Each structure stands twice: as structure tokens, then as C-alpha cells.
């Protein structure tokens, strides 16, 4: 399926493999709502993956009617059709769903859908992957050796490169040097090399999203960014040298700034991204700024991979009140990045 570009030429919509997430949360409702949106049909061709019975229950909860083309995995290609496609793996009886609880059945359902979506993109049958929220505890029930999605993705794709999570809002991105580790271990994981590597990956991902001259603000680790060494030396010994090396490479990067005001500065002064030193240093700010619009993007992969930044919301599952905003933004970001990657590949 093609759409008209700005110059009147025809261009193919990006094909996005969308994996249904945890069936016990709001994922079925979000998936159904998303597939019914007209602007999503204009932006991307979606191959949704899951169990049709679970999706139909989500549509009932959401109060939407779906017009989907059924397809098998063997029959898919990357051309895209007028209607979104649903691949029914038929692997979970709705009677086995315990709404509002993390279970082995829910974890198995979500991870199988996710694996299938990744394999489609890896095989060139999709330009990007998105997934609605699933629960890490349920994932560990199904795959005990995995703490988060990143290791799972790397193993499915046999990918050995660097993969990092970015949190994305329309006006600002958040990158982080460390992620899912105890707070007491953060300082020992910081180095000039680690920060510089994250800045390089952030710059590359921002370019894929259309930011040719990205402006990045770097947060300090300690209160008041160390206040000249009064509250810690990491800014002087590690963060400042990393920023200087990045600037020498031509990056438009500034900092370190105090973490309690760096996002205010970024929004006021037009920074495209803020790099924080640890997980919650950025997550708290991003979710206050735009919880219902936030997207998590896994950078460094051969294709865009996006999901809403919120979780499964077990407490409101089945009530028909889930906000589609972040899921919609995840699809739109994946579509934009897929188009940009395609354009860069064509120009190479």
C-alpha cells in the first residue's frame, strides 16, 4: 500500500510488526484501539500478532470494530496491503487469562508474539517492531534467564552490538548511561568511555529519527552536579572529560548540568535529548512531563523497536479506560524512523 508524498510521488508505508503484550493487562484493549485509528492506517501498515480471541475481547472492552485481513506467517511480505493484517497464532484460550495478574500463560503469550515480530523484521518482512506492554515478572515465568527485553531481543536476533533504551517525548528524548542496576552500583559503572559510547549511540538514533544536528544536554550524577567537587568527584573526573571528548568529535553536547533542573533547561533551550546517569534520574522527569505520550525505543538495532513507556496497568485492565496516547506515539515514531532508515539506505 502506498501513500502520496509531499511532492505528489507515491511512497510505500512502513510495515510494522505489532506484538500483543500481556493479555492480563491493558494490552488487548490498546492493540484493538490502535488498529481502529485512521491516522495509524495512513502512517503505517501493521502486521499484528497474537490470538484473535484475545484481540476480539480487547475490541469489546474498547468498544471498537476491527477490519483486519487474516494472514499466515508464510504468506506475509513487505509490500503492505490496504488493510492491517492479523496473524492469529491461536495460542491462548481467553478462559485461561487471569486479568490483573502476572502469570506463566500471560508471559508465554506475550514473549511468543514478541519473538514472532522480531523474526519478521529480521527476515525483512517488517521495517520496524512495536509491542504493547508486557510484565517483566510474567516474562521471567516464561523465560527465567531474562531480566528485561533487551537481552531477549539480542538473543532472538543473535545480535552482539550495543542496545540501549531511550525514552522519547515529542519535545525531548532521554538517554541513560546505566539502566536496570541497583542505585548503589551506578557510580562504579560510570566511565569516560561508557558515557562517550552512549553519546555516540544517542547521536546516531536521533539522526535516524530525523534530527540532523541534535543538541544533547548531559546531567551530573551528584547533587548540584557535584558543586565543584563538594558532593562528589564524578563530574570532574568522568562526566566533564566525556563531554569534552564528544565536543571534540563534533557533537553538540553540553553539561554536566544539575539533574534537578536539566530537563527544565532542555525544554527551555531547545535540547533534543537529555543524557542521565541512571534510570530514575530521567524516568521521573519524563513521566511527569508526558506519561500518556512517552515511548520507549530500543536503539542500536538494525530496525526501529518501540513500545509505550508505561506498563500493563493491571489495576484498570478490562475497564475500557486505557489511554491510547503512548501506544499511538510508539507506532508513529517507529514509522518515522523506518522511513528515515529506508531513505538513508536508498541514498547510500
Swiss-Prot record:
Catalyzed chemical reaction(s): 4-(phosphooxy)-L-threonine + NAD(+) = 3-amino-2-oxopropyl phosphate + CO2 + NADH
InterPro entries: PdxA_fam
Details of cofactor binding: Binds 1 divalent metal cation per subunit. Can use ions such as Zn(2+), Mg(2+) or Co(2+).
UniProt EC number: 1.1.1.262
UniProtKB keywords: Cobalt, Cytoplasm, Magnesium, Metal-binding, NAD, NADP, Oxidoreductase, Plasmid, Pyridoxine biosynthesis, Zinc
Pathway(s) annotated for this protein in UniProt: Cofactor biosynthesis; pyridoxine 5'-phosphate biosynthesis; pyridoxine 5'-phosphate from D-erythrose 4-phosphate: step 4/5
Group of enzyme by EC: oxidoreductase
Pfam families in UniProt: PdxA
Binding sites annotated in the UniProt record for a divalent metal cation: 180, 224, 279
Swiss-Prot/TrEMBL cofactor(s): Zn(2+); Mg(2+); Co(2+)
Main location: cytoplasm
Protein localization: Cytoplasm
One Gene Ontology term from the biological process aspect of the record: pyridoxine biosynthetic process
Any one GO molecular-function label of the UniProt entry: metal ion binding
UniProt record similarity statement: Belongs to the PdxA family.
Quaternary structure and partners: Homodimer.
Known role: Catalyzes the NAD(P)-dependent oxidation of 4-(phosphooxy)-L-threonine (HTP) into 2-amino-3-oxo-4-(phosphooxy)butyric acid which spontaneously decarboxylates to form 3-amino-2-oxopropyl phosphate (AHAP).
Note from the entry: The active site is located at the dimer interface.
Protein name: Putative 4-hydroxythreonine-4-phosphate dehydrogenase 2
Organism from which the protein derives: Rhizobium meliloti (strain 1021) (Ensifer meliloti)
Organism phylogeny: Bacteria, Pseudomonadati, Pseudomonadota, Alphaproteobacteria, Hyphomicrobiales
